[in-house]
């Protein structure tokens, strides 16, 4: 059994802030935990514009705090987000998140991220193998 708190993760190598400071992700469960997924708490700053494309991962996101917009860049659709909203990037959609207020979301990635990934110039996480 694994039990962790966000308090113990804060300011460790599991607590990642984007280079532009727009978002912060606390990686609660990572690939090294060997459970087949990773689980993160991500906070995105109000008024920021954030483009992502998880070409190698499926991501499920549940918004627990804040409001904003999700723009599906592949299908030219826009969605309002509020607490209780969930979106699933099961088609590896390129997307943009534009928070009106600070957004806090709980995210699940499959395959799991290892914690060493960095978004490339296209917003993509590379597929990093979990060492045996």
From Swiss-Prot:
GO MF annotation: an example: ectoine synthase activity
Transmembrane segments: none
Reported function: Catalyzes the circularization of gamma-N-acetyl-alpha,gamma-diaminobutyric acid (ADABA) to ectoine (1,4,5,6-tetrahydro-2-methyl-4-pyrimidine carboxylic acid), which is an excellent osmoprotectant.
Keyword Cell division listed: no
Recorded family membership: Belongs to the ectoine synthase family.
UniProt protein name: L-ectoine synthase
Species this protein is from: Rhodococcus erythropolis (strain PR4 / NBRC 100887)
Domain of life: Bacteria
Claim: Cell membrane is one of the keywords in the record: no
């Amino acid at each position: 059994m694994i039990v962790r708190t966000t308090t113990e993760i804060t300011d460790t190598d599991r607590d990642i802030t984007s280079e532009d400071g727009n978002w912060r992700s606390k990686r609660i469960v990572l690939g090294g935990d060997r459970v087949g997924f990773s689980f993160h708490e991500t906070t995105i700053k109000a008024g920021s514009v954030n483009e992502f494309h998880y070409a190698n991962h499926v991501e499920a996101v549940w918004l627990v705090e804040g409001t904003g917009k999700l723009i599906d860049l592949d299908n030219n659709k826009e969605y309002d987000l509020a607490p209780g909203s969930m979106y699933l990037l099961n088609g590896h959609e390129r997307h943009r998140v534009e928070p009106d207020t600070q957004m806090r979301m709980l995210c699940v990635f499959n395959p799991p991220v290892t914690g060493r990934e960095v978004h490339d110039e296209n917003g993509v996480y590379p597929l990093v193998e979990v060492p045996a």
